[in-house]
């Protein structure tokens, strides 16, 4: 919320600080940039590419907000703790935490290894749990925690997608219970559950979502995916970012403990 020249401007986040995990590219980058455009100062978290993260920082600064990039592997709890400590050390406080880091996985039940199970759940589930824990410990009163689920967690069943879907189903439960645990600090906890969203990862895995998907080009698969929604268009990172921006705002306060499907009605 913001007051400019004595006038209240709905939806603005001026004076707020947001930590967005996994925001060097894709949906996370779109969220970080959008929150920056709404006036928040942003901590861009990344695990691998400092160059990609710096591009996001530059976009946010170009929009008039401050931003820094902090490298931290969300699979490592000590690095999550350091991420939030450094965010507070730099900006003085944190008001919004968007838990976006994740990996995708496909495999028939008979073929899934222990190593693959641990790879997926260590980030999608365990990582998000401890991001939320550190967010609660560091967030100012009245803050926002926004987690990332998927429409495959319950409404959209995809063969050979059990690890990913299950890892996100746990997040749905986290959101519901965390909203109770965080009430003493007036922190709301919600989740977004994207459907197929056009990013580089989408093009890498879209053949898994479409029967005989290997027969089609990436462009053809994207066109086919658009018809999963009655709106007959694809979802894009900005579609997710717009909802996250609302949940982070004062106007989103009465939404709490909810996971919002963002799939254009595909499910």
From Swiss-Prot:
Top EC class, one word: oxidoreductase
Pfam families: adh_short_C2 (PF13561)
Record keywords: NADP, Oxidoreductase
InterPro entries hit by this protein: NAD(P)-bd_dom_sf, Sc_DH/Rdtase_CS, SDR_fam
Record-level Gene Ontology MF annotations: oxidoreductase activity, acting on CH-OH group of donors
EC number(s) recorded for this UniProt protein: 1.1.1.-
Signal peptide: none
Keyword NADP among record annotations: yes
Inducers of expression: Expression is positively regulated by the transcriptional regulator wor1. Expression is down-regulated during biotrophic growth within tomato leaves. The expression is induced at later stages of infection when conidiophores emerge from the plant and produce conidia.
Keyword Oxidoreductase tagged: yes
Residue numbers binding NADP(+): 27, 73, 100, 133, 164, 168, 199
Active site (record annotation): 149 (proton donor), 150 (proton donor), 164 (proton acceptor), 168 (lowers pka of active site tyr)
Pathway the protein acts in: Pigment biosynthesis
Family classification: Belongs to the short-chain dehydrogenases/reductases (SDR) family.
Role noted for this protein: Non-reducing polyketide synthase; part of the gene cluster that mediates the biosynthesis of the bianthraquinone cladofulvin, a conidial pigment not required for virulence but that plays a role in fitness and resistance to environmental stresses including UV light and low-temperature stress. The pathway begins with the synthesis of atrochrysone thioester by the polyketide synthase (PKS) claG. The atrochrysone carboxyl ACP thioesterase claF then breaks the thioester bond and releases the atrochrysone carboxylic acid from claG.
UniProt-recorded name of the protein: Short chain dehydrogenase claC
Organism whose genome encodes this protein: Passalora fulva (Tomato leaf mold)
Organism taxonomic ancestry: Eukaryota, Fungi, Dikarya, Ascomycota, Pezizomycotina
Gene symbol of the encoding locus: claC
């Amino acid at each position: 919320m913001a007051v400019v020249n004595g006038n209240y401007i709905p939806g603005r986040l001026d004076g707020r600080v947001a930590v967005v995990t996994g925001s060097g590219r894709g949906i996370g980058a779109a969220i970080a940039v959008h929150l920056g455009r709404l006036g928040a100062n942003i901590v861009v978290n990344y695990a691998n590419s400092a160059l990609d993260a710096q591009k996001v920082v530059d976009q946010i600064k170009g929009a008039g907000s401050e931003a820094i990039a902090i490298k931290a592997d969300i699979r490592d709890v000590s690095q999550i703790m350091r991420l939030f400590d450094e965010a507070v050390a730099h900006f003085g406080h944190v008001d919004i935490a968007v838990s976006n880091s994740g990996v995708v996985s496909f495999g028939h039940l008979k073929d899934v290894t222990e190593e693959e199970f641990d790879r997926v759940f260590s980030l999608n589930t365990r990582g998000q749990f401890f991001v939320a824990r550190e967010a609660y410990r560091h967030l100012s009163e009245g803050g926002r925690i926004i987690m990332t689920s998927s429409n495959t967690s319950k409404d959209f069943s995809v063969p050979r997608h059990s690890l990913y879907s299950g890892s996100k189903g746990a997040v749905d439960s986290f959101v519901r219970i965390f909203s109770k645990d965080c009430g003493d600090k007036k922190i709301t906890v919600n989740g977004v559950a994207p459907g197929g969203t056009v990013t580089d990862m989408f093009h890498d895995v879209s053949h898994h979502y479409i029967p005989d998907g290997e027969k089609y080009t990436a462009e053809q698969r994207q066109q086919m995916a658009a018809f999963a929604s009655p709106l007959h268009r694809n979802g894009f990172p900005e579609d997710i970012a717009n909802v996250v921006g609302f949940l982070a705002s004062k106007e989103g306060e009465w939404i709490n403990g909810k996971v919002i499907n963002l799939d254009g009605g595909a499910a």
